[in-house]
Amino acid sequence: MASRPYAQPRLKGAALAVLLALAATPAAAKCGNGAGGFENWLQDFKGRAASDGISKGTISSALGGIGYDSKVIQRDRNQHSFKLSFQEFYARRVSGSLISHGRGWINKNQALADRIEKRFGVPIEVVVAIWGLETNYGADRGQGFSIVQALATLAYDCRRADFFETQLMAVLGIIDRGDMSAGQLRGGWAGEIGQTQFLPAAYLKYAVDFDGNGRRDLVNSVPDVLASTANFLKAHGWSAGGGYQPGSSNFGVIAEWNKAQVYQRTIAVMAGQMK
């Protein structure tokens, strides 16, 4: 039976007051291009983190006391590495000692290398090349920034707010599950974590506990670092047994790690020299 039309009731008294109050409630705090609105934005984000299931303890320990970091914004506005030609980039970032170090590590750790190759189907020299290029085998991780504070600053900044808010929520998830503490999460200005520089969302999705201690530690555990890097490549379509030089399908998978063509070519060349 069709419903009968009915008259819209008029709002009176308290009901009207509630509606007007709701209309006057400020919208979610907006992004900004300076420090002025950061604290309001942060309070709003804490509420969203709680709604997303992050524990009160993690929100308090990770986000309490952080502030807007202008040095992060300066670094973000002054990126130049990937504007270089391949020859310029390779000459600046790769040395003979970087190659020999990687080759030597593979020779000395063949059992671990074989385990990673067998499990993920990715040649160890590709994984080690990424490790070497990203942080000089863990030696140059860039400990100058609080990763949580850097990500909060970039999430508040209007340039790529949605992307970095996703990364900030992910890093809270890493802390919440007990993989790392906020204090351990120090690194570069863009929020990458550990020895091969995982962004937090990728860390949550692809990190592997390969040393068997129950934690996925991409800062201190080399087995976890290399296995997680191989797992990322496998998950993005790496074809076991295939090549990785330009023109191959696996060369395209390297682009999922870093979109810069000079980076992809550098990894392929480095890996070829480590075999």
Spans of model-derived segments:
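Bacterial N-terminal signal peptides that target proteins for export
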Residues: 2-15
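N-terminal signal peptide c-region/cleavage motif recognized by signal peptidases
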Residues: 24-26
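Mature N-terminal segment immediately following signal peptide/propeptide cleavage
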Residues: 36-56, 60
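Catalytic glycan-binding domains that act on GlcNAc-containing polysaccharides
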Residues: 54-275
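Cleaved targeting-peptide boundary
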Residues: 29-36
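Hydrophobic alpha-helical targeting segments used for export or membrane insertion
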Residues: 16-22, 149
